[in-house]
UniProtKB/Swiss-Prot annotation:
Key word Chloroplast present: no
Organism: Geobacillus thermodenitrificans (strain NG80-2)
GO biological process: asexual sporulation; sporulation resulting in formation of a cellular spore
Record-given protein name: Small, acid-soluble spore protein P
Expression induction or repression: Expressed only in the forespore compartment of sporulating cells.
Length: 48
């Protein structure tokens, strides 16, 4: 039972990070901003 819960949690995490479906627009907007600011890009990478 614990494994099932773990799998579901992991799947949700992977979907949010790996699946660029919903977070696609956000990532795009962030990417553009990051591209404009090289320093911010480094910070974002560290934050992630």
């Amino acid at each position: 039972m614990t494994n099932k819960n773990d799998s579901k949690d992991m799947r949700k995490n992977v979907s949010k990070g790996d699946n660029p479906g919903q977070p696609e627009p956000l990532d795009g907007s962030k990417k553009v901003k990051n591209r404009n600011h090289t320093r911010q890009k480094h910070n974002t990478s560290h934050d992630m």
